[in-house]
């Protein structure tokens, strides 16, 4: 999966609560994907916008991280609705 494909899925499915490589502070109850030194991380935040302990997963490839991000973002949206 590519960033463009993820953006298309987010738009088509009207998914909310995702931080797709944005350089900003975390928001409450969102799924975050970030790249640090060619390693990709996906994690969830809580109601105080803090990283949820145990939620962070590290990936060696962007594709794996994006797959995980979109799966978890879909789940987050099911829980919110």
Regions flagged by a language model, labelled:
Residues 55-59:
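A structural signal for short, well-ordered beta-strand elements
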Residues 27-54, 72:
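Short aromatic-glycine-(Arg/Gly/Cys) micro-motifs in beta-strand/loop hairpins
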Residues 32-36, 63, 81:
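Phox homology (PX) phosphoinositide-binding domain
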Residues 75-81:
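Intrinsically disordered, low-complexity charged/polar segments
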Residues 1-26:
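Negatively charged, low-complexity tracts enriched in Asp/Glu with abundant Ser/Thr
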Residues 18, 23, 39-41, 50, ...:
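Residues in flexible loops and secondary-structure boundaries
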Residues 4, 60-73:
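A short, charged, amphipathic alpha-helix used as a generic interaction element across diverse proteins
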């Amino acid at each position: 999966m590519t960033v463009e494909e993820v953006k298309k899925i987010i738009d088509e499915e009207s998914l909310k609560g995702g931080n797709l490589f944005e350089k900003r502070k975390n928001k409450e109850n969102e799924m975050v994907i970030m790249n640090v030194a060619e390693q990709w991380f996906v994690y969830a935040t809580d109601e105080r916008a803090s990283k949820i302990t145990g939620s962070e997963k590290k990936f060696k490839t962007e594709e794996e991280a994006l797959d995980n991000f979109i799966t978890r973002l879909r789940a987050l949206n099911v829980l919110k609705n």
